[in-house]
């Protein structure tokens, strides 16, 4: 290469270096903005003592986990009225190895929190719609990610489609219990006068299974106790086995 060609190549190389640095800076700025947006708007803060009215929180514990063993959390918003709705999400069920292997249920949480909330409540009882009869109620939401009607306490070993040994964590009842205990300790809602336990699909089965536990252990003094099972149907001929 002669001196003339070398001289022409130097500015191009310099420009490429500058462009590369600009791209790196832009990527870093976008990453920082994404993190800020996530923690400021999309990820709810952890529940604290005496939570603010009308603000969403996540209710987490290290022992809470989804079907794959990853972290799980419930969602909470304190209302201005002395009324509480406990809402169980649906999303399939797993009762044997075939169903565990084929993922016939929600296997993990929807992230981030805001999306999980919107997805769970779109058009539902706990949605933030002006004029809703529940808009000023305290809301306790349980996303579904354990395939056990929110009522499991065990582990199920199975072989997946790739021949790998796996564990399905039926941890729904443990998640529910840990969340309820934390909420009752921090939120100041133990004297609610009206309580509604509800859920749809698989969450409807949770409603039927857990409502007695809720009214016995958490809201025994509520004057108005309600249970609403929504759209829950299970056709399985071997259920009695």
Predicted regions and their residues:
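Short amphipathic alpha-helical surface micro-motifs
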Residues: 55-57, 68-69, 118-126, 209-210
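Surface cap/lid and interfacial helix-loop subdomains adjacent to catalytic sites
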Residues: 36-53, 63, 155-156, 169-196, ...
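A domain-start/cap signature at the N-terminus of enzymes
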Residues: 17-25, 29-81
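N-terminal Lys/Arg-rich, disordered targeting/topogenic segments
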Residues: 1-18
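Structural recognition of the beta-strand scaffold that forms the well-ordered cores
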Residues: 84-88, 138-143, 196-198, 226-230, ...
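Active-site machinery of serine-nucleophile hydrolases
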Residues: 63, 77-182, 186
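Flexible loop/turn segments at secondary-structure boundaries
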Residues: 93-95, 148-149, 204-206, 233-238
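Glycine-rich nucleophile elbow surrounding the catalytic serine of serine-hydrolase chemistry
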Residues: 200-210
């Amino acid at each position: 290469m002669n001196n003339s060609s070398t001289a022409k190549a130097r500015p191009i190389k310099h420009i490429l270096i500058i462009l590369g640095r600009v791209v790196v800076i832009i990527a870093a700025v976008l990453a920082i903005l994404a993190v800020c947006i996530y923690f400021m708007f999309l990820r709810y803060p952890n529940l604290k003592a005496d939570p603010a009215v009308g603000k969403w929180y996540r209710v987490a514990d290290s022992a809470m986990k989804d079907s794959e063993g990853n972290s799980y959390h419930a969602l909470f918003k304190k209302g201005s009225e002395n009324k509480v709705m406990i809402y169980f999400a649906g999303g399939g069920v797993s009762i044997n190895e075939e169903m565990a292997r084929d993922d016939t249920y929600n296997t993990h949480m929807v992230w981030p929190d805001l999306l999980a909330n919107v997805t769970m409540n779109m058009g539902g009882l706990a949605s933030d719609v002006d004029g809703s009869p529940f808009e000023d109620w305290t809301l306790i939401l349980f996303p579904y990610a354990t395939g056990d009607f929110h009522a499991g306490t065990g582990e199920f070993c199975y072989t997946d489609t790739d021949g790998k040994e796996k564990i399905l964590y039926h941890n729904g009842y443990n998640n529910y219990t840990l969340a309820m205990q934390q909420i009752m300790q921090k939120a100041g809602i133990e004297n609610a006068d009206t309580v509604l336990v509800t859920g749809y699909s698989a969450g409807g089965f949770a409603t039927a299974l857990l409502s007695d536990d809720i009214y016995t252990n958490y809201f025994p003094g509520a004057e108005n106790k309600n249970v609403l099972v929504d759209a829950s149907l299970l056709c399985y001929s071997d259920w009695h086995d």
